[in-house]
């Protein structure tokens, strides 16, 4: 406990002192109602909505509640109409005892916004109790020597009612010797005394019986009676006299049973039996008598435990009686001292165990504290721990509200165990703790968050449909339906991208699937956005960028751009016989639609008519000579080259290259007949045979002179016709060969053009000299060279 008390100054503390209560009462006017006790249940006390100044329906919508001290429901509120009804009969004497006025405090609490209203119901007393004497019979012993005017105390009657309904007067039945006088104590209670009017004579009348009546002030009046039996004794001159008529003593309430309280003392001047004094309790006041007295010594002890919270003062009337029956009376005023024997009590009036996370200053609990002790023992300190986002706010009449200090964050902390500590200021301090559990309810205040800011995924082309490519994942810090995420494909920025035909997504787990086979050569990569939406209301969403990269497969063989591979007439390259070793004949140009290493091409010479004469550079496809040409080398050569990529599996293409060795570029040339296809060669041979036969037939029909003339003409025409049929189709020889890669297919010094015109039955070769700057002095010579045309008829068999 000491450790806990040491921590209290470090906590948020709210001191609730009596002065605070008084200030609150003075500044906050309570709504007061009054009604008589014992009113039948169902009685309408008032219309609460009207008295509070709010609409009738507002009581229901704002969750109006009534709280009472002690948690006993005395009233019932109809929130729809605002009427306040009595739930049961109320007994003022049971609820308030002798306290006047009898005020029942209750609080009305409204929510949204939180409001408190202090309300009081005062119960007025009705005369529903009659006076009652503690004994049905009283015994008095009066000596016959008593003088008129002598006063004899009588026991008072008790009436549970208060005010005018309590005992107001005492009477005695008519007689010759006594009358009753009614006196008031300091607290207003009435008590009777019997006054002797006429001297008594024991020999004439040894006994008397009187009827003592107690009357209250109600209308109609109620009464109670007791019998007073008087014995007249022989002369007893002196009655006992107490040393003090009033004894005042203070007794702590925690004194044990049989604890000593005080000693009273009385003396009697008579001698003998008339001087012997005995002590007794004359009359106790209250429900029970917690004291006993020793009849010989006059010592008063506790017979029951005292409780300051129930009765703080006791007035004990002590009677001292001598042997002759005379008595004297004194009063012992016992003040019960409060000790800190009651721990503070905490009563939860309203509790909200589920608090929305985004609400500020939400009332979590309404509670009241009380301590039955007084003074510092009843002053209290109320506190909660520092490290939680909650505050304690005092309202009124020992009421507090526990509110959130600001908006809570369920994602940071979903549950709080709040310990409310109430300590009094007594010695030693007593402490009461109450722990409430507050759960933070989720609000959809967090959008889904992707595990990556962007995603890059790879898929090989020629994939199978429905292939699982990858998974997009998002999380939501909320809970329940607020954290349930659905995924979707967002419309692409590129309207030409048919995303719905390429990709699909599983709405529940974010798995991406390919809808069809992808082609790297058609689409290398594409981007799109994936959205994640939670199930809250309103729903929150986020999106992330997904970049899909199509990986190339080696599904394309190299494609040769040059030389053109045409089934009708392959291309022929010219090689000067005087070419030096390393002479560039041509360059094989090829491409591969694949990418990366699948498009890395290499060249290889597979086969050649003269293997040692030619070589191919592996990386650029240049075909060069490896040595000087000799007279023994053939004039025509056929090379078979292989172009292959670096993929897996490897793909390749073959290139056939024809090389014609010429003495110089100044000589006319034609491709050999053998370079044509075999089917065309066969056709040419048949045609030649027919022309020879036709020429022989015509020659035999003419005279020798005519035959010679005509024969020469016919032979020339036949040969021209034959050469015309052997002509190569136009366009098979590129007019200007340009190195696509920039390395140069032909030597920069030689650009040539071959034109074969079959329509004129002549073969024309146009040779272009190397391009050199033409000086003015050379203009004429250059002009003559430009007009040079050579006409030759050359046949290859």
From Swiss-Prot:
Q: Which CDD domains match?
A: Cadherin_repeat (cd11304)
Glycosylated residues, chain numbering: 169, 276, 417, 566
- Where does this one sit in the cell? Cell membrane
Q: Could you give a GO molecular-function term held by this entry?
A: calcium ion binding
Gene Ontology biological process terms from the UniProt entry: cell adhesion; homophilic cell adhesion via plasma membrane adhesion molecules
Q: Which residues cross the membrane?
A: 692-712
Sequence ranges assigned to domain Cadherin in this UniProt record: 35-133, 138-242, 247-346, 351-450, 455-560, 567-670
Domain of life (superkingdom): Eukaryota
The record places the following residue ranges in the Cytoplasmic compartment, namely 713-797
Q: Which UniProt keywords apply?
A: Calcium, Cell adhesion, Cell membrane, Glycoprotein, Membrane, Repeat, Signal, Transmembrane, Transmembrane helix
One Pfam family from the record: Cadherin_C_2
Described by its record, this protein's role is as follows: Potential calcium-dependent cell-adhesion protein. May be involved in the establishment and maintenance of specific neuronal connections in the brain.
Q: What is this protein called?
A: Protocadherin-3
* Organism in which the protein naturally occurs: Rattus norvegicus
Gene from which this protein is expressed: Pcdh3
């Amino acid at each position: 406990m000491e450790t806990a008390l040491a921590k209290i100054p470090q906590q948020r503390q709210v001191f609730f002192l009596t002065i605070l209560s008084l200030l609150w009462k003075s500044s906050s006017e309570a709504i007061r109602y009054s009604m008589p006790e014992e009113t039948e249940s169902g009685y309408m006390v008032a219309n609460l909505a009207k008295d509070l100044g709010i609409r009738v329906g507002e009581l229901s919508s704002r969750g109006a509640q009534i709280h009472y001290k002690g948690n006993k429901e005395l009233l019932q509120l109809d929130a729809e109409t605002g009427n306040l009804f009595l739930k049961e009969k109320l007994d003022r004497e049971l609820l308030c005892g002798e306290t006047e006025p009898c005020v029942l405090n209750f609080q009305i609490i409204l929510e949204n916004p939180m409001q408190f209203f202090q309300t009081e119901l005062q119960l007025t007393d009705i005369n529903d109790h009659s006076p009652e004497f503690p004994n049905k019979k009283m015994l008095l012993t009066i000596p016959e020597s008593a003088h008129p005017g002598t006063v004899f105390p009588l026991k008072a009657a008790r009436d549970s009612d208060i005010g005018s309904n309590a005992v107001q007067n005492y009477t005695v039945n008519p007689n010759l010797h006594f009358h009753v006088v009614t006196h008031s104590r300091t607290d207003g209670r009435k008590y009777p005394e019997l006054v002797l009017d006429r001297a008594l004579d024991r020999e004439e009348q040894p006994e008397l019986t009187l009827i003592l009546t107690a009357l209250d002030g109600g209308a109609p009046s109620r009464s109670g009676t007791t019998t007073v039996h008087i014995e007249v004794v022989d002369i007893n001159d002196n009655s006992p006299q107490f040393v003090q008529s009033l004894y005042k003593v203070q007794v702590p309430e925690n004194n044990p049973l049989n604890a000593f309280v005080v000693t009273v003392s009385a003396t009697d001047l008579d001698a003998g039996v008339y001087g012997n004094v005995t002590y007794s309790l004359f009359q106790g006041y209250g429900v029970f008598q917690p004291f006993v007295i020793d009849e010989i010594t006059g010592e008063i002890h506790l017979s029951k435990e005292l409780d300051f919270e129930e009765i703080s003062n006791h007035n004990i009337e002590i009677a001292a009686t001598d042997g002759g029956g005379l008595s004297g009376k004194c009063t012992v005023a016992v003040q019960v001292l409060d000790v800190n024997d009651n721990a503070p009590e905490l009563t939860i009036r309203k509790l909200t165990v589920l608090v929305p996370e985004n609400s500020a200053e939400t009332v979590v609990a309404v509670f009241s504290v009380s301590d039955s002790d007084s003074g510092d023992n009843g002053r209290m300190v109320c506190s909660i721990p520092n490290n939680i986002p909650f505050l304690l706010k005092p309202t009124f009449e020992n009421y507090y509200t526990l509110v959130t200090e600001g908006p809570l964050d369920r994602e940071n902390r979903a549950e709080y165990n709040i310990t409310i500590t109430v300590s009094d200021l007594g010695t030693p301090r007593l402490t009461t703790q109450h722990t409430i559990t507050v759960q933070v309810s989720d609000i959809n205040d967090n959008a889904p968050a992707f595990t990556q800011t962007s995603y890059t995924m790879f898929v090989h082309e020629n994939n199978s449909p429905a292939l699982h490519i990858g998974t997009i994942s998002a999380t939501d810090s909320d809970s329940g339906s607020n954290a349930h995420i659905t995924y979707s494909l967002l419309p692409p920025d590129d309207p030409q991208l048919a995303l719905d035909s390429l990709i699909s997504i599983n709405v529940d787990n974010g798995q991406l699937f390919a809808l069809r086979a992808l082609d790297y050569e058609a689409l290398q990569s594409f981007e799109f956005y994936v959205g994640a939406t939670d199930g809250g209301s309103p729903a929150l969403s986020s999106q992330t960028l997904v970049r899909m990269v199509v990986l190339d497969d080696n599904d394309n063989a190299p494609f040769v751009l040059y030389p053109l591979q045409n089934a009708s007439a392959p291309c022929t390259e010219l090689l000067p016989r005087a070419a030096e070793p390393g002479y560039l004949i041509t360059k094989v140009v090829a491409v591969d639609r694949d990418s990366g290493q699948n498009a890395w091409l290499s060249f290889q010479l597979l086969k050649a008519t003269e293997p040692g004469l030619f070589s191919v550079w592996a990386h650029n496809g240049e075909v060069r000579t490896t040595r000087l040409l000799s007279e023994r080398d053939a004039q025509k050569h056929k090379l078979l080259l292989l172009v292959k990529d670096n993929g897996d599996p490897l793909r390749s293409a073959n290139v056939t290259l024809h090389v014609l060795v010429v003495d110089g570029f100044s000589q006319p040339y034609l491709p050999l007949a053998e370079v044509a296809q075999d089917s065309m060669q066969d056709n040419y041979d048949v045609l030649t045979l027919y022309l020879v036969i036709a020429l022989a037939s015509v020659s035999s029909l003419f005279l020798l002179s005519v035959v010679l003339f005509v024969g020469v003409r016919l032979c020339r025409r036949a040969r021209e016709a034959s050469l015309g049929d052997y002509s190569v189709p136009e366009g098979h020889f590129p007019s200007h060969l340009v190195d696509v890669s920039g390395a140069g297919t032909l030597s920069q010094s030689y650009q040539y053009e071959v034109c074969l015109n079959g329509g004129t039955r002549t073969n024309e070769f146009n040779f272009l000299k190397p391009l050199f700057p033409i000086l003015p002095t050379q203009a004429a010579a250059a002009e003559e060279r430009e007009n040079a045309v050579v006409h030759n008829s050359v046949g290859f068999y």
